[in-house]
Amino acid sequence: FRDILNDNHMGGQSYDFMMASGKLQALCYKHEIEKTLRTPDYAGFQLLALNDYSGQGTALVGVLDVFFEEKGYINAEQFRRFCSPTVPLARIPKFVYANDETFHADIEVSHFGAAPLQGAKTSYTIKDKFGKVYAKGTVGTQTIPIGNLCALGSVDMNLKEIDTPQKLNLEVCIEGSDAVNDWDFWVYPAQVELTQGSVYTTDTLDAVSYTHLRAHETAA
């Protein structure tokens, strides 16, 4: 793999490629595992391996390297957010919103701990990447039985306060335990003023396109 990158003049980008593909891998694991935990009467799931396989050839497919050490794009604490005995879950219809919409999430929990969680209080926070809190509150307080698909409540947030493109994060935690999980979503202005400027945009190479290209060549 190193030689292939070097032959294509990308040897210096090895770390960037690993981090990009690794973050995507971790996100896929998160969504796949959460999907199984949200499925009624699902009997469980199995992961073939968590580490890279270096036997007959090389398969760099693990979230850990061949020595069972972290690669740098996800750690044990982050993995346990969506893969542990107690996992808060969210049913979110979509992850991209306009600011004239309302964000909504139905909150559930998958709990296969040693005993039910008596009088468990579930809270939530919505914040941006800088830590600014836009909304927070309590989802509900109830005893959480052993099993999956225990409904806890819902979260709603009017997005009109968001007037610039933002990535926000919903975090849900069950107080008094280490059960916490989070999800990113994106908000964009519903109305955007477009400035034509000097950039010509087209998906067809026609006479008008050639005119703009020739004008650019003349100016250059």
Model-predicted segments: where are they?
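Low-complexity, Pro/Ser/Thr- and charge-rich linker/hinge segments at domain boundaries
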Residues: 185-204
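Terminal connector regions
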Residues: 162-191
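Intrinsically disordered, low-complexity Pro/Gly/Ser/Thr-rich segments with frequent PxxP/GP/PP motifs
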Residues: 133-163
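Acidic, proline/serine/threonine- and glycine-rich low-complexity intrinsically disordered segments
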Residues: 207-209
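Intrinsic-disorder/low-complexity, polar/charged segments enriched in Ser/Thr/Lys/Arg/Asp/Glu/Gln
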Residues: 102-104, 121, 152-154, 180-182
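Conserved small/polar residues in nucleotide/adenosyl-binding loops
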Residues: 211-218
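Substrate-binding clefts and catalytic carboxylate motifs of secreted carbohydrate-active enzymes
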Residues: 1-118
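Beta-strand-rich binding/interaction modules
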Residues: 102-140, 166-175
